[in-house]
Amino acid sequence: MVIEDISSILRQEAEAVLNIPVVAEYNEAVTLIVEYVHNRNGKLITSGMGKAGQIASNLATTFSSTGTPAFFLHPSEAQHGDLGIVRDNDIMLLISNSGKTRELIELTRLTLGLAPDMKF
């Protein structure tokens, strides 16, 4: 791979980010993250399965590296003990292609059992 190829890939990725549609749901998500993480001293918890899980993991890493407390919680691991890290002032960002991912539905149910006011 040469410099021109790398530059082209980076330009394409930057353009993709710039073209993210800013709709009401996006604005609401950003507002919730600011409220819970920065105003309430919570954490941003991301989760997803498969490729969506890789995206969620990358998001958590990016947020963490820019000063926003965040981590990736694998849905299956959450069911076997890792859910104990979740607190009431945290917020979850769940990534799913279909919106019907079985493991994320179960993660939501289990989380609400521990933190009934959790925002997703």
Predicted regions, residues:
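Glycine-rich phosphate-binding loops that contact phosphosugars or nucleotide phosphates
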Residues: 34-38, 43-120
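An N-terminal, well-structured beta->alpha segment
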Residues: 1-42
